Amino acid sequence: MRKSDRSRLQQLWFALAGTLICASGALAQQSPPQRPQPIVAWSAKPVETTAWTAPNKPHWKLADVLTKHSGQRSWQEDIVSDRDFIARYISMAPGEKSKRQFFADDRVFWIVQSGRMRVSIDGQQPFVATQGFMVQVPYRVAYSIETEGSEPSLRFEVRGAQAVPLYPIDETPVPMDGKKYMKVTYTGHGAYDEVNKPYLDFIKDVVNANGRGGPFVKDDKTFANMIRGPGQPAPPASNLGHFHIGYSEFWLVLEGKIDYLIEGVPFFTAEPGDVVYAPQGRWHRASFGGNGMATRLAINPRPDGMHNFQAPED
């Protein structure tokens, strides 16, 4: 290569490198993408606020549930029952084991409140879940739970409102009122993906890692989303939050303190293990309370559900 050609080639490389450096610097200085601008519209809020129907109520305190079942080792307490979900606290005595079962078209998930449980899910290695573990099983995938150790295991479990347990052919079904178990054939089953994992160790993977939260369950009809942040002063009472149309929402407090303002209910604070329920159409506002970090698991049937916020005054 002639000297003049080599010189021109070096100049070209220097020019190209300078262009790349300038471009990367410009990209670094660009601001993050902005949120979409709110759209002002007419929404249909119920004239009469939707009532709570048992077992649903504004605030279930875990302490009250435990007091009610004091001295019992194996028990269940229904906490939520509506069009979309059934959620309950379930305590299993040491050594107690569930039958292998699955659900036809719904995921089931639970959060371990205390104790140790051995979880066996078809297609996965068995694992032991302890306090703070969040576990989910896709539809038509059989699983079982067994309490380990000398203490009961306690979990908060959520399943579809119309979901009933089905059983592998080598299992004996538990009789159910109004149902007759019979042999059938079926095909296919659900699967895990980038969002939906067999389990999450909330204490290890989120709290100790100072994680940000995010969805744990997300499909076409179930959304369980961890919302995490530092404690802050409560917003003014004039901040009503938002409401939903056609579906209700509930939260399990995972960490810290969560402040709530729900239409028709005085301001209150919920603590770990507590469950809060807002019927469809009611204004509700959740905020991080206390001095440390706080996390709530928001549960509803609409991953991209509409949030009806207050419109600016004219």
Regions from the language model: what does each represent?
Residues 2-14:
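Bacterial N-terminal signal peptides that target proteins for export
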Residues 13-24:
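Bacterial N-terminal signal peptides
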Residues 29-86, 99-100, 165-234, 240, ...:
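A short, N-terminal "cap"/entry segment at the start of jelly-roll beta-barrel domains
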Residues 88, 99, 108, 125, ...:
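Short, conserved secondary-structure segments in the cores of folded domains
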Residues 91, 103-119, 228, 243-259:
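Short, conserved beta-strand element in jelly-roll/cupin
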Residues 99-100, 119-120, 137, 143-149, ...:
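Short beta-strand His + acidic residue motifs that chelate non-heme Fe in jelly-roll/DSBH
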Residues 123-139, 264-280:
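Short acidic-glycine-tyrosine-enriched beta hairpin
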Residues 144-197, 285-314:
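Double-stranded beta-helix
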